Amino acid sequence: MAMKAVCVLKGDGPVQGTINFEQKESNGPVKVWGSITGLAEGLHGFHVHQFGDNTQGCTSAGPHFNPLSRKHGGPEDEERHVGDLGNVTAGKDGVAKVSIEDSVISLSGDHSIIGRTLVVHEKADDLGKGGNEESKKTGNAGGRLACGVIGIAQ
């Protein structure tokens, strides 16, 4: 049975969006789609963070969701956090159209992202290839522009 989830992204500034998730089989890939507006043109890190806690804005969401205790990487890398979804790309109009399929995140089980926070970052994610310690943790993606808790959808 297909599972669906949704996340409404909001922040302190103009960045906002809605991201949808669908997983047709419990061990199958998750389709991720939607749009984010109010971004500066270019690449922005896009990650699922550990906690569904937004009591102190996006900072209380904690680090990237990483149940396997791995180093940060890109979505195509073997060595990555479960929550590492790479980058979204905003055009001149400040809109990022998101269309991703990921086989590491899940909407159920040990890698479930339900109840965790999705974050869009200020800068590009270097996918763990930046050559410093921060790159291996966060991809040097910078501040958290907007976030929201991922919830079950109809």
UniProtKB/Swiss-Prot annotation:
Compartment(s) of residence: Cytoplasm; Nucleus
GO cellular component term, pick one: cytoplasmic vesicle
Residues that bear Phosphoserine: 99, 103, 106, 108
Cofactor dependency: Cu cation; Zn(2+)
Positions that bind Zn(2+): 64, 72, 81, 84
Biological process according to GO: auditory receptor cell stereocilium organization; embryo implantation; glutathione metabolic process; heart contraction; hydrogen peroxide biosynthetic process; intracellular iron ion homeostasis; locomotory behavior; muscle cell cellular homeostasis
MF GO annotations: copper ion binding; protein phosphatase 2B binding; protein-folding chaperone binding; superoxide dismutase activity; zinc ion binding
Disulphide bridges: 58-147
N6-succinyllysine modifications at: 4, 10, 92, 123, 137
A Pfam family it matches: Sod_Cu
Post-translational modification remark: Palmitoylation helps nuclear targeting and decreases catalytic activity.
Keywords: Acetylation, Antioxidant, Copper, Cytoplasm, Disulfide bond, Lipoprotein, Metal-binding, Nucleus, Oxidoreductase, Palmitate, Phosphoprotein, Zinc
Primary localisation category: cytoplasm
Catalytic activity: 2 superoxide + 2 H(+) = H2O2 + O2
Cofactor binding mode and count: Binds 1 copper ion per subunit.
Region (Disordered): 62-81
Cleaved signal peptide residues: none
Lipidation (S-palmitoyl cysteine): 7
UniProt EC number: 1.15.1.1
Role played: Destroys radicals which are normally produced within the cells and which are toxic to biological systems.
Protein name: Superoxide dismutase [Cu-Zn]
Biological source species: Callithrix jacchus
